[in-house]
Amino acid sequence: MEQNIIELKHITKTYEDGFSAVSDFNLEVKKGEFITFLGPSGCGKTTTLRMIAGFDIPTEGEILLNGKPITELPPNERPINTVFQRYALFPHMNIYENIAFGLRQKKTPENVIVKKVRKVLELVDLEGFEKRRVDTLSGGQQQRVAIARAVVNEPQILLLDEPLGALDLKMRKEMQLELKEMHRELGITFIYVTHDQEEALTMSDKIVVMAEGKMQQIGTPEDIYNEPINAFVADFIGDSNIFNGIMTGKLKARFCGGEFVCVDDVEEGTHITAVVRPEDVILTEPAQGQIRGIVSSVIFKGMHYEITVESGKNEIVAQSVYSAKVGDRVGVHVDPDNIHIMIAEDHTNIFPAEINKNNELEYNGNVLDVALTTVIKGSRQTEDGAILDANGSEIDTGKLRIKISIKPQDIELTDVQEEGLVQGYISNLIYKGDHYSYVIHTDLEQDFVVDDEYLWNMEDQVGLLMPVEKMIFTVKK
């Protein structure tokens, strides 16, 4: 059995203001693996890396290195080195001295330093650069020096926090391949952080997809791309057509206005999310398609055309080596094994309400237009405002807990924030064929999911209009 070099057990990082950057995170990394933390900004990937390095201490949980706890161990006592996006090279030292710095701190003999520095210079293809100044190097060369300085100490684990972020596109692509080759030659464990899906797919043995401080999925690049576990992963990894639908029979699903044969055996009547990659969409003559539509957009991407087809309220994006004309009527065909079916997630929003001294329901300082006697079945209110149960006994409303639930499609967004029951900003959005699914991070530090047919922008400040008649109230004592 392969040995776990690093284990994270129920790791949580919560800051003084109550913000949870990482929540109940569990991970096992095998010796010699190249593993990548992938996710959008603010998902907790860098915080997790910093806890492995020892720069941050988890609020809860345990970190093990080769089976031994290192949660409280300071960074300098861990056999772990880190390469950051900003390489932090010493400008007053030449390349040789930059690389040798860590070895000198350890009081390594000079003859050993010479051998090790020469070896890593050869590894990063910088032989002959020993006496060069840092400011004479290109961005890619500086990045190699930073990696050489890290690996010369022979760490068991190398952490890389978006090290290619400062490079141009061509240099990034070259360095992706070079890093993968370095990993193969060194044989040490690489843990890499990026928001760039192409980097993750190109270099990794395993990818950990993160969102909002939680692991969404872990798997090989092929697993993550071909078998996303939820709509977030499908949307974040590569381009995807994502549709809500329902299973209509054995290996049959209806979505996007048509019925499709699929290979995922999900029970009939189950609400599903269907994922189809643009490269798997085949455009045909209208009569030959499973659904039909009109071409609304054609964009040349170099290696292919990106063609958008409107079918009713749905949009389907296809990639094709053949062009089309805007306004063309086309058929859309997808082979069964190119349809990925996931059981639909229940995104019902649940939040607490308070009962004020007047026995009125409040949320976020707003009185809700609903009588408490409507919420508490069988109750009635006296003239002095007391709430009595069906037996005539007074209810101590201070001991009641009221939960409100409301469906994403029943909430409306408004740019007049003060009109909303609660306010916040759009932190995530996914297009689902005939509508957008938004995550709103509110001022109360709660996330709401809202379905809306209109396109809003990331970071837009919005108010949430929530009709009382669409709310379901649950009473707990």
PLM regions and their residue ranges:
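Helix-to-loop junction immediately C-terminal to a conserved catalytic motif
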Residues: 53
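Glycine/charge-rich catalytic "coupling/switch" loops of P-loop NTPases
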Residues: 254-297, 321-428, 454-477
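Conserved ABC transporter NBD signature motif
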Residues: 61-69
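Internal alpha/beta loop-helix hairpins
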Residues: 194-258, 304, 335-358
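ABC ATPase nucleotide-binding domains
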Residues: 73-85, 89-232
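Short coil-to-beta microelement around the adenine-binding A-loop and adjacent beta1/P-loop entry
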Residues: 18-20
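The feature captures the beta-strand-to-loop junction immediately N-terminal to the Walker
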Residues: 38-40
